[in-house]
Design a protein with these regions (language model features):
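General secondary-structure edge motif
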Residues: 4, 87, 108-109
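Hydrophobic transmembrane alpha-helices and their membrane-interface boundaries in multi-pass
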Residues: 14-92, 99-105, 123-127
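Transmembrane helix interruption/hinge and helix-loop junction motifs
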Residues: 89-95, 111-115
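N-terminal membrane insertion elements
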Residues: 109, 114-119, 124, 128-152
Length: 152
């Protein structure tokens, strides 16, 4: 196996482990919300958190099946990370903003400008969409609505 394939396999396994940690953090935040330690609307958190956790766990299952050696695995991992953050940011706009750096950081492990650029563009488009989706179906944020109204 050449060094490039070995690096890609290693990056796939590392990214999958990172997303498992993200899934555990989401599960912990969900439990803290259910026990009313975090103050988030349960009608938003209860339907979205299982979907987010599912998206974050899919790469670990794929890597377990394939060993992370297939060429398409990196695309599946980055797709799942972007979609998980998109759902999080749509449901909770205030809390999902910083999480948008995660897919880009994961894409940097592959040492591919094209892949990082593609991840950045997808993240920017979905981040913009999540702001508008979050205004209407996500957690209420009057400041976000005022900013959208007064900016044009």
């Amino acid at each position: 196996m050449n060094a490039f394939m070995e690096n890609e396999t290693e990056a796939n396994l590392y990214a999958a482990r990172c997303l498992v940690i993200c899934a555990f953090l989401c599960a912990a935040a969900w439990l803290l919300t259910v026990f009313r330690i975090f103050i988030l609307p349960l009608e938003i958190v209860n339907p979205t958190m299982p979907v987010i956790i599912f998206f974050f766990l899919i790469p670990a299952l794929i890597c377990r099946r394939t060993g992370g050696k297939k060429g398409w695995v990196k695309y599946a991992i980055l797709f799942c990370s972007v979609m998980g953050i998109f759902i999080l940011s749509s449901a909770m706009p205030k809390h999902g903003v910083m999480a948008w750096t995660m897919p880009l950081m994961l894409s940097c492990h592959y040492y591919s400008k094209k892949l990082s650029r593609m991840t950045l563009i997808a993240s920017q488009i979905l981040f913009s969409a999540s702001i508008y989706i979050g205004m209407f179906v996500g957690e209420w944020d009057q400041i976000l609505l005022d900013a959208a109204y007064y900016s044009g």
